[in-house]
Amino acid sequence: MKKILILANNDVGLYKFRKELIEELLKDNEVYISLPYGNLVDNLIKMGCKFIDTPVDRRGINPITDLKLLNSYRKLFNKVKPNLAVTYTIKPNIYASLVARFKKTDYAVNITGLGTAFQSDNLLRKLIVFLYKIALKKVKVVFFENEENQNIFINENIVERNRTCKLNGAGVNLEDYPFMEYPDENQNIHFLFIGRIMKEKGIDELLEAAGKIKKEYPTVQFEIVGPMEDNYKGVIDKYVGNGIINYYGFQNDVKPFIEKCHCFILPSYHEGMANTLLESASMGRPLITSNISGCKEAINNNGYLVNVKDSNDLYEQIKRFIELDYKDKVLMSKNSRKHIEEVFDKRKIVKETMKGLGS
């Protein structure tokens, strides 16, 4: 029985999006989980994982804390002696991979998105590219969730193409996100956004577009679900107070919100593969999202693409959807589910991942 060490920076993403993969790995292996303790860790332990509490500072680069993390990973590898390490998120991807490389341990890395650091040509980006080049020198496989991110790593000479594998995101569990009948024709139209309230998710453009739409279509509702960055509190309070949006904060279960909505909106600036789009489409909801890698893959006769950072285009596409015949909205709903079943079925993604890991 092999030992597999999974390293990440939080329990939520690992449990919510990789649960089925972990279940598959547990069939023939001992699975160790290294990340900071969180509310879902106990669920991972109940599945059969062995948990090792490892503090990870998710934001920014601090030489002192990052060296501590590197050292804690070194001790962890000495203790567990894994046959394979699997990493998620940037710091485990770099620092755990560095340890695995020099320990001559097989390791696989997951790039679920490039984040804000890769969006501008600055010193931080150059440092990250440099560290990735060293860390991934001997990697077994690097999994990507979209072709654009894959090509960036290849073109930057971070990793060779034959060591990469593109997956269709983390996939969707079709039973966890079942098709739900489209809302009744007589109901007020509800648009839904789920995500962190931050600039990179396109929240500024959404708020501006929503304000214009509400003037023309007062009965249309905009529902916002997700945790808020501190600098947006005043803005969100203002839009709620003016009756433009309804804000529900973070929700453990977003499915009731998806079921209620007529269309899901995500005007993000960059994504690896937007799980909220896939989950909403799986439940049969049309989509409006950015014409970028990580978002556009979810669209197939089931919604509209918008120009990134373009609030006017977003307004136009929202208006276009409102004016659409009800029967066409229902057809989009069915197309959403069909597309997810054909391309993003979690079972297919897990199978491809296991193949990439050599299992």
Feature-to-residue mapping (PLM):
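Donor nucleotide-sugar binding/catalytic pocket of nucleotide-sugar-dependent glycosyltransferases
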Residues: 52-53, 133, 137-179
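Aromatic "clamp/platform" in nucleotide-sugar-dependent glycosyltransferases that forms part
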Residues: 250, 269
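Conserved acidic donor-binding segment of nucleotide-sugar-dependent glycosyltransferases
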Residues: 304-312, 320-326
